[in-house]
């Protein structure tokens, strides 16, 4: 797993010391507002083991986020395979980009900074043709990050997430960033 560095962040391999703050994030109703149920410590630990194994297997996945100035764990960001049951899945669906930060890390631009590093890795290192991002229609903070990193949304692509039960979290938006757009914006 390569380590990525930005001006203020380190995107790195998960450590044992990340497990407690990661579990606290997953037990925080505000952090999980647009994600559904809260996770137990055991579920959070299992998620880290799975994320690490998938990254090692595929060459991409979820990095732990660390604030460079303090060394503090502040969340995760990365790239993931698009689930096969998503309505937009297919040969050209690319991968999904995402982020999740501790509440204390909100509002500082960390999600945008981490996402830009993940996009660059996806396009420049992995050679991905496209990166997508999804969130609930009500998650305006994440949608703002998607726009700030240059992704675009066509409302015709909005969808019902088949993995989510009926309710306010089921309706989702889809943002896209084709490789050619990334090249144009980074030139």
Model-assigned labels for residue ranges:
Residues 1-20, 24-34, 49, 66-187:
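Acyl-donor (CoA/ACP) binding surface of acyl/acetyltransferases
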Residues 30-51, 60-63:
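Conserved GNAT-fold acetyl-CoA-binding loop/helix
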């Amino acid at each position: 797993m390569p380590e990525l560095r930005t001006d203020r962040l380190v995107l790195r391999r998960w450590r044992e010391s990340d497990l407690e703050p990661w579990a606290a994030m997953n037990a925080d109703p505000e952090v999980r507002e647009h994600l559904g149920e809260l996770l137990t410590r055991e579920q959070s630990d299992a998620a880290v083991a799975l994320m690490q194994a998938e990254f090692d297997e595929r060459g991409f996945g979820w990095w732990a986020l660390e604030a460079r100035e303090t060394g503090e764990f502040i969340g995760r960001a990365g790239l993931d395979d698009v689930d096969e049951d998503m309505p937009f899945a297919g040969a050209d669906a690319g991968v999904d980009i995402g982020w999740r930060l501790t509440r204390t890390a909100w509002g500082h631009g960390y999600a945008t900074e981490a996402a830009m590093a993940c996009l660059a890795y996806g396009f420049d290192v992995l050679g991905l043709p496209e990166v997508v991002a999804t969130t609930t229609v009500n998650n305006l903070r994440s949608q703002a990050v998607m726009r700030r990193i240059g992704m675009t949304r066509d409302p015709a692509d909005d969808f019902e997430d088949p993995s989510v039960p009926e309710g306010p979290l089921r309706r989702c938006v889809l943002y896209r960033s084709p490789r050619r757009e990334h090249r144009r914006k980074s030139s």
